[in-house]
Amino acid sequence: MASPTIAANAYANLARVLENSGAGKGSEASGQSFASLLKDAVGSVMESGRKSDAQTVAMAAGKANVMDVVTAVADTDVAVSTLVSVRDRVISAYEDIMKMPI
């Protein structure tokens, strides 16, 4: 179950991505490329996974709180779910483009 903190972080990340990508600015070339945006998103998911793994190892060693581990795992779950959703939308858009007549 998503907590308000996770939702707030997701909205903040989305706002940052939209701000950095230049959404709504037309076709200006000053924003990031789509490839670098995806690379950053995947890197963010990987970092979230690493933090989750580190928290799990720390809990197994008796050095971490269970709540911290649950929060880290939930954050990773949200990040992976978001990434999978974006992947599905990109594939769907690609398939729609391929169906267009030339």
From Swiss-Prot:
GO terms for molecular function: cytoskeletal motor activity; structural molecule activity. Keywords: Bacterial flagellum. GO terms for cellular component: bacterial-type flagellum basal body. It is found in: Bacterial flagellum basal body. Signal peptide: none annotated. It holds the Pfam family FliE. GO terms for biological process: bacterial-type flagellum assembly; bacterial-type flagellum-dependent cell motility. The keyword Amino-acid biosynthesis does not apply. The keyword RNA-binding does not apply. PANTHER family: FLAGELLAR HOOK-BASAL BODY COMPLEX PROTEIN FLIE, PTHR34653. Belongs to the FliE family. This is Flagellar hook-basal body complex protein FliE 1.
